């Protein structure tokens, strides 16, 4: 049993729940039909915005699946349901470290307003998962 991996998995279960519930509600507000009421779906502007919105939905789905699978892997490793695997552990740890650093850099480079940076502080969770998983790898 590895409590560090269990903790990383639990953090990701929480992140998944928050992502699905709050993220779905937040993202629905950006639906092009809400911004451009009364315009036909065939309208070029609506179609372009709809395509961009759907691409964002694809990314949202990818992140949802990634959070769920990563949580499952960390919990399975922590509970001893699957054997320790250094490559898997390193991959998961570096994935979250990379996401944390990259997302923080994007927010800084974009010079987003403070309220936006505060709302989008996902990098804190990503780095906490990476640090926790790194501690688990050391055992």
Predicted regions and their residues:
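Membrane-water interface of alpha-helical transmembrane segments
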Residues: 2-9, 50-60, 86-89, 115-119
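Juxtamembrane helix-break-helix junctions at the cytosolic face
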Residues: 69-89, 107-111
């Amino acid at each position: 049993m590895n409590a560090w991996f269990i903790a990383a998995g639990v953090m990701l279960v929480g992140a998944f729940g928050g992502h699905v519930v709050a993220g779905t509600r937040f993202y629905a507000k950006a639906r092009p039909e809400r911004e451009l009421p009364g315009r036909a779906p065939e309208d070029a502007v609506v179609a372009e915005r709809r395509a961009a919105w759907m691409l964002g939905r694809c990314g949202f789905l990818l992140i949802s699946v990634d959070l769920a699978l990563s949580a499952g892997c960390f919990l399975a490793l922590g509970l001893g349901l699957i054997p320790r695997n250094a490559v898997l552990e390193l991959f998961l740890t570096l994935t979250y470290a990379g996401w944390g650093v990259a997302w923080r850099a994007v927010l800084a480079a974009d010079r987003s307003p403070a309220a936006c940076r505060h709302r989008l502080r996902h990098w804190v969770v990503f780095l906490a998962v990476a640090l926790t998983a790194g501690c688990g790898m050391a055992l």
